Amino acid sequence: MYHALVEGRPEHSEGTDSSWLVEDKHLHVKRVKSTFKGSKQSITHWRIEDQDEFVSLIEINIETGRRHQIRMAMQFLGCPIVGDTIHGAATDPLNRICLHATSLGFTHPYTNDFVQYESNIPFANRFKTDSKPER
């Protein structure tokens, strides 16, 4: 699970971005049609966790793991991630891209146990919500 602070307010409270992305030899990512040679599907689920008149805190879950997938999805939504000037953000008040992995899990390669790590949202203090991700 990821959390992002985005500029503006999405039109809907939740949604899914399903798109096709392609990388060039310089690792730049573009949104393309599914028939474009080398394109890969990208599926991003999101929901608004909190918002004010300027920014929204978005919870994000991905089905695929494409380079810049979340950044491209938020840009297409019309709400670029705060600090992500490459993908359309007009603001960078924290001198960083406000995208953070709040929960990561994987099967341990030696024990085969499922291991999960969680962390606080470093920019959640923008709101009056707890900085722990909701479960």
Give the label of every model feature segment.
Residues 1-135:
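RNA pseudouridine synthases
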